[in-house]
Amino acid sequence: RTGRCEASLSGHTDSVESVCWGGVGFIYSASRDRTIKVWGAEDDTDRGEGRTVGKLVRTLSGHGHRVNALALSCEYVCRTGPFEHSGAHFASAEEAQQAALVRYNKTGGGTEAEVERLVSGSDDFTLFLWSPTTQKQPISRMAGHQQLVNDIAFSPDGRFIASASFDKKVKLWDGRTGTFIATLTGHVSAVYKVAWSMDSRLLVSASKDSTIKLWDVSDPKTAKHTLPGHADEVYALDWSPNGAQVASGSKDRTIKIWRN
């Protein structure tokens, strides 16, 4: 609460484009120097792990151009809950707890899902999938976009990755292996942003073409809805915690709220 700087992390040789807190005591950074760096975010020296705040743990290399974006799979752990997309209410706390447990088990809870996975997107048109706390080599190199990658997002359940690109496309990938799943086409200009619904069923994308598109990942061939309304490029998107609404922000200086 003092506002003091706790640590200054130096090591990148060009500007830092993205930072991401991990869930197991690390912080990740992406840079124009084409690397991702893994830093200690907790002081574990008293436990004999040799990790201190700000200490460089490892450098992840492989991209051929600047790294624009990072996304971390462990985010879903904070969001797992008794969500019901139909809007139905649970009769009791016990029923809600059981629904949450079912959703958690579907993610592979208690097994490999506990290992953080990091995905990076670059100006070299590729994405890399990493296990950043355990190895320097990527799990997968994900190629397919024809222009630079603007944004990436893990689905809350960790099963999917969505990527947005200047090539006007959104692509879906397997969140554990990096295997390509589908290309979502429909935007007529660069796609800037993607965001998942809390139950991982739906995806929204925002574009330079001034529209937002809503996709159902079970049938991604065509957009479920196109949401016109902004008068200029759409830069920002987010779902409400209850999954019922989407907020968007545009170059037209407005924020719009859409109901699912």
Task: Please tell me what each predicted stretch does.
Residues 1, 19, 36-41, 49, ...:
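WD40-repeat beta-propellers
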Residues 26, 35-37, 64, 126-128, ...:
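A conserved positional marker within WD40/Gbeta-like beta-propeller blades
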Residues 29-33, 121-124, 156, 163-167, ...:
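Conserved strand-to-loop turn within each blade of WD40 beta-propeller repeats
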